[in-house]
């Protein structure tokens, strides 16, 4: 009886074990978000080919008009065609997000890398300053700096948003640099007389860029939201500069007249773009965590 049980235990069938199928290239990747984001960006870049009317023209005979065949997305309180404004203004919103992210990433990489290779006392000083800067509300800093710089324009607003959103990336860069600063290739580059920026570009950036990629993507999202928030509050770009944020600044008048499309359509495009960037950023973070867990 015992031998029979051992025979049964040893003769388990293995034919039913299904080999793991190969993972599809698109699985685990934000394909839909990337496709939607690319489509929105391309449409904004090709706005002149898509626009049905002049986005700056104020047709006072057709203000607050609901969507129809002539005005696909309706008109705003000043009679401007919202369909044309979406694509025309989207370029500026995306441009501000991109410029602000480039500025914040550059500052973060330089400050974080310098802190990572600096002596302990200087590293401590830089990190304490970074933490103090990080503790101040970002929106308050943006408003203060913009007030100092004067009237807002695309460049000044991008600069102000950029110089107030570098701290989180800088801390990650500093941590990564401190882990590799005593590597043989870094020491060899120093011995050969390479300067800080050459070592940073040639040796340090390739090692930590994947770790901050998701934060860079998230910064684009944050910059676009900041621009929209400032425009909504009436302290961003002038009303004649069309962006998704400036379109939303007319929401108070739209609510009074029941013109829901003035709020819904720009808000929908802004939220869709932000969600796509969020999904892409989360995918970058998961990819980075997966790579780090394999080591």
Feature annotation, model-predicted:
Residues 147-149, 177, 226-265, 269:
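Glycine-rich helix-loop "coupling/hinge" segments at transmembrane-helix boundaries
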Residues 18-23, 53-101, 250-267:
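Periplasmic/extracellular loop-to-transmembrane helix junction in inner-membrane transport proteins
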Residues 164, 217-220, 259-295:
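C-terminal transmembrane helix and the adjacent membrane-cytosol boundary/short C-terminal tail
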Residues 1-38, 279-295:
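Transmembrane alpha-helical segments of polytopic membrane transport and secretion proteins
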